[in-house]
Amino acid sequence: MTKGTQSFGMRHNKSHTICRRCGKRSFHIQKSTCACCGYPAAKTRSYNWGAKAKRRRTTGTGRMSYLKKVHRSFKNGFRSGKPAAAVAASA
């Protein structure tokens, strides 16, 4: 058997399986690390040379149920639901 193209047909074992954090088939079984998100590291793996990859999974690509509310309340100056206090007229 040669060490080139013919040998690649002999490969059967999977080196990567599904990652529990990102859901991609990038979790290396022997290394126990994900090639996509870096799991089990606390911080998500991201590099500037992967600008497209960053764009796919950055803030704003999901539901953003809380951040949408924050933007709305920021526009209104973070007012609570109470009516504004009456200001004494100086005459």
From Swiss-Prot:
InterPro entries: Ribosomal_eL37, Ribosomal_eL37/eL43, Ribosomal_eL37_CS, Ribosomal_zn-bd. GO terms for molecular function: RNA binding; rRNA binding; structural constituent of ribosome; zinc ion binding. Its cofactor is Zn(2+). Zn(2+) binds at C19, C22, C34, C37. The keyword Zinc applies. Disulfide bonds: none annotated. A zinc finger (C4-type) spans 19-37. It is found in: Cytoplasm. GO terms for cellular component: cytosol; cytosolic large ribosomal subunit; preribosome. It comes from the Eukaryota. One of its GO terms (biological process) is cytoplasmic translation. Belongs to the eukaryotic ribosomal protein eL37 family. Component of the large ribosomal subunit (LSU). Mature yeast ribosomes consist of a small (40S) and a large (60S) subunit. The 40S small subunit contains 1 molecule of ribosomal RNA (18S rRNA) and at least 33 different proteins. The large 60S subunit contains 3 rRNA molecules (25S, 5.8S and 5S rRNA) and at least 46 different proteins. Component of the ribosome, a large ribonucleoprotein complex responsible for the synthesis of proteins in the cell. The small ribosomal subunit (SSU) binds messenger RNAs (mRNAs) and translates the encoded message by selecting cognate aminoacyl-transfer RNA (tRNA) molecules. The large subunit (LSU) contains the ribosomal catalytic site termed the peptidyl transferase center (PTC), which catalyzes the formation of peptide bonds, thereby polymerizing the amino acids delivered by tRNAs into a polypeptide chain. There are 2 genes for eL37 in S.pombe. This is Large ribosomal subunit protein eL37B. It comes from Schizosaccharomyces pombe (strain 972 / ATCC 24843).
